[in-house]
């Protein structure tokens, strides 16, 4: 590209300015015309060069004028909008007049053409009859006004020499600075980093040192015209074919060396595998030999023969007794089985005391037959009926569990009627609807059994009679309420819940007083206790006033009361609640 001095006139035309290629007889018909670079702030087009086919139109060959080029109807989009101060029929020239220089003639020239409607009327009343206006650059005289055209008035031609600030801004660009420096120092034209080496840029050689800034000759290093698309299909909304930066990046990617990964073996090496040899005639140790190596056992015998087999287990084979214990609140139970002919039963144990079951059973039977006969010693009269899991051995040898309700420990059996709806007395054949009524009838009339005893020594066959008797002692002396509280039968929190009875103290005079006390406090307490009578001696006179006095051997089982401890009163809940029936 070549820019000219600042004295270069400004052409202000209406509508749009279309740059063209000068096709003189001394220049090739096609040439490469680079567009301005993006480094100039006046342009918004990319810096990719484009070549356009031009059609020659000879207008005036007598004056040796350069042929005119037909107008290509495309616009250059300026990055700066026109100033509002300019006339409505004046358009800014945002493209330098010398941006498109074609050919390598001895006399370089710059031409431009405009597309103007013939009926356009200017402010001075003149009209533009010709569609093209040409301006020629002479050899040494620089720019001169174009020859007068009949269609353009003198005042209109004078506008070409009027300077404009917009044009000065355009000339003061980096390309103008490059031209001045290139003419003096023979510098190459600046190229964008995205341009290709095959683009037809020119460079100047300063061969004549004259006073002008215009180089005397132009040398092209590539005069071959590049292929350009059809001008009718040019769209300056650039497509991907006209984006040099993407092409440049693609070239860089293609220039990258190929990375070859190391080939790893994809096949698994074959390791030798030896098939195990099988000999059907090989000697296999017989079952007799294997059994003979076992330790001697009375339940196992070996008989010799062609097919040696072990004899079946005898039906009568003594096994050691198994002793198992449950949790802390369960009692131990020992089961001795003399003989078995099936699997080993599975049992669970409840709060019953130690029981001893002896007998034998066959497969298909249960342990309930041998657990019915138990020792009833040590059970409280009002204990709830316990539940026991019994292991049942089926005919197929599998273990089956079922729950059965263990009968309460009663000394008197309660027979049922044949229908099972009533209870019949075995002595008088009297029927009762409830078992406790029948049991009470037998104890009071037939056996005269009195299992309920008071601390005073009196016995009762019914528990409710005992409670009525105890209330007499409590009403006479409230201090005796703690002795008749049924702590062995009920807990203090939930009535009806059985608790374990506490171990009685053997001697009331043995009072522990040395726990958590100093030596001085222990001496004072001993002196105070020595001056007082034992608690058992204080209780006896009060009870002796009643006909049924407490026997001396029962006093040793009374709880202990310290001198500073108050006597607890009977809980009203315990005093008036009904007790469980016998």
UniProtKB/Swiss-Prot annotation:
Residues in C2H2-type zinc fingers: 423-446, 452-473
BP GO terms, sorted: regulation of transcription by RNA polymerase II; response to starvation
Location of region: Disordered: 24-55, 107-154, 347-366, 375-422
PANTHER family membership: MIP31509P, ZINC FINGER PROTEIN YPR022C
One family name in Pfam for this protein: zf-C2H2
Stated role: Transcription factor that globally supports gene expression in response to hydrogen peroxide.
Gene name linked to the record: hsr1
Low complexity composition bias: residue spans: 126-143
Protein name (record): Hydrogen peroxide stress regulator 1
Amino acid composition bias (Polar residues), ranges on this chain: 107-125, 375-392
GO molecular function: cis-regulatory region sequence-specific DNA binding; DNA-binding transcription factor activity, RNA polymerase II-specific; RNA polymerase II cis-regulatory region sequence-specific DNA binding; zinc ion binding
Induction statement: Expression is induced by hydrogen peroxide, and this induction requires prr1 and pap1p as well as atf1p and sty1p.
Protein's UniProt keywords contain Ribonucleoprotein: no
Compartment(s) of residence: Nucleus
InterPro entries: VerF-like, Znf_C2H2_sf, Znf_C2H2_type
Keywords: DNA-binding, Metal-binding, Nucleus, Repeat, Transcription, Transcription regulation, Zinc, Zinc-finger
Example of a GO cellular component annotation carried by this entry: nucleus
């Amino acid at each position: 590209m070549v820019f000219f001095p600042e004295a270069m006139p400004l052409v202000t035309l209406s509508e749009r300015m279309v740059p063209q290629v000068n096709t003189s007889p001394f220049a090739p018909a096609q040439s490469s015309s680079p567009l301005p670079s993006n480094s100039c702030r006046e342009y918004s087009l990319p810096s990719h060069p484009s070549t356009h086919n031009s059609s020659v139109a000879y207008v005036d060959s007598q004056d040796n004028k350069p042929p005119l080029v037909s107008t290509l109807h495309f616009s250059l989009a300026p990055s700066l909008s026109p100033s509002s101060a300019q006339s409505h029929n004046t358009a800014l020239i945002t493209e330098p007049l010398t941006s498109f220089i074609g050919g390598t003639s001895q006399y370089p020239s710059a031409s431009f053409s405009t597309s103007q409607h013939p009926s356009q009327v200017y402010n001075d009343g003149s009209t533009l009859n010709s569609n093209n206006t040409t301006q020629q650059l002479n050899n040494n005289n620089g720019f001169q006004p174009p020859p007068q055209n009949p269609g353009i008035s003198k005042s209109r031609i004078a506008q070409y020499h009027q300077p404009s600030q917009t044009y000065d801004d355009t000339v003061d660009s980096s390309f103008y600075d490059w031209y001045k420096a290139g003419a003096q120092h023979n510098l190459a034209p600046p190229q964008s980093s995205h341009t290709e080496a095959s683009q037809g840029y020119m460079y100047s050689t300063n061969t004549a040192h004259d006073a002008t800034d215009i180089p005397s000759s132009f040398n092209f290093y590539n005069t071959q015209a590049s292929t350009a698309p059809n001008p009718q299909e040019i769209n300056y909304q650039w497509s991907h074919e006209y984006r040099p930066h993407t092409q440049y990046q693609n070239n860089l990617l293609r220039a990258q060396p190929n990375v070859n990964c190391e080939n790893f073996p994809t096949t698994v090496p074959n390791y030798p595998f030896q098939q195990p040899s099988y000999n059907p005639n090989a000697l296999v140790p017989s079952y007799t030999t294997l059994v003979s190596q076992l330790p001697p056992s009375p339940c196992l015998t070996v008989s010799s023969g062609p097919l040696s087999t072990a004899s079946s287990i005898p039906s009568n084979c003594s096994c050691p007794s198994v002793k198992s214990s449950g949790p802390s609140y369960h009692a131990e139970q020992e089961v001795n089985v003399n003989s078995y002919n099936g699997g080993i039963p599975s049992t669970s144990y409840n709060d019953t005391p130690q029981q001893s079951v002896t007998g034998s059973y066959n497969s298909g039977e249960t342990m309930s037959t041998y657990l019915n006969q138990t020792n009833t010693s040590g059970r409280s009269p009002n204990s709830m009926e316990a539940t026991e899991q019994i292991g049942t051995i089926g005919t197929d040898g599998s273990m089956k569990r079922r729950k059965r309700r263990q009968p309460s420990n009663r000394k008197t059996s309660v027979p049922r009627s044949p229908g099972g709806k009533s209870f019949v007395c075995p002595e008088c054949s009297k029927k009762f609807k409830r078992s406790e009524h029948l049991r009470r009838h037998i104890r009071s009339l037939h056996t005269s059994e009195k299992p309920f005893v008071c601390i005073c020594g009196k016995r009762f066959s019914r528990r409710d009679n005992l409670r009525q008797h105890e209330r007499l002692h409590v009403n006479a002396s409230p201090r005796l309420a703690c002795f008749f509280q049924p702590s062995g039968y009920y807990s203090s929190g939930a009535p009806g819940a059985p608790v374990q009875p506490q171990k009685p103290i053997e001697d009331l005079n043995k009072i522990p007083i040395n726990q958590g006390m100093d030596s001085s406090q222990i001496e004072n307490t001993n002196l105070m206790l020595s001056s007082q009578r034992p608690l058992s001696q204080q209780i006896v006179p009060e009870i002796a006033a009643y006909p049924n006095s407490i026997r001396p051997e029962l006093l040793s089982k009374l709880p202990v009361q310290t001198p500073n401890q108050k006597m607890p009163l009977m809980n009203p809940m315990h005093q008036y609640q009904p007790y469980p029936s016998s």
